[in-house]
Amino acid sequence: MGADLLIKNAKIVTEQGVISGSLAVKNGKIAAVASGDLLTEALEVRDIGGKYLFPGAIDTHPHFFDPGAEWREDFWHGTCAAASGGFTTVLDMPNTLPPVKDGKTFALKLRRAMAGSLVDYALWGSAMPDNITDLEELQRLGCIAFKGFTLDAGPDFQWSDEYEQLREMKKISELNGIFGVHAEHAVLVQRFTELYADEEWSLQVHDKSRPPEAELTAVNTL
């Protein structure tokens, strides 16, 4: 066959289970998997000493905050971390500054991803009350899915009440698209946040301000 890369002595993780054997790569794709040794020549041969060999993982929910808040994390540092953990594809969320809400903001973020990403990537788009007419363009440009919020997500990312959620769902359904929702009931979160406002902030207090009932109510409404 002749391969570009032959990986030997591997524990190969497959849908059917773990195979102790070898894997050949040709033109950037898996060409063959076999138990034991593959009898093929290769430009490069690696014996990985019985280590596990996984397919590249996909992170569907990173927040790289690039552009707008790169001090938190940008595409370069975020995808370096992804690659070190075995993630070869990232699907980045649209909560950037500005959010990905139309063709202009999509193009801006795409340039940042092209310049900084170490791994394969795709981009989510936003679904907000003021950009429903832009969803079709976003999909055409390459947005893989749309993200909406059922509660306040900051001044730059509009959240949607039940009426707006219905409008967004109908439009995305017409596009045969995918709609992902940050589902927490706005009133419950607001009231519980007010209830614990006088307590010193901690992870435990933050958790109490967003009880399971807030998520369950939002999901049931959706």
Model-derived segments and spans:
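Metal-associated gating/positioning segment near the N- to mid-region
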Residues: K51-G116
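Hydrophobic faces of well-ordered beta-strands that scaffold small-molecule active sites
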Residues: G56-P62, V90-D92, Y121-G125, F146-G148, ...
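Active-site mouth loops of central-metabolism enzymes
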Residues: T60-E73, T96, D120-N131, F157, ...
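Histidine-rich, glycine-flanked metal-binding segment
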Residues: M1-L6, K11-P55
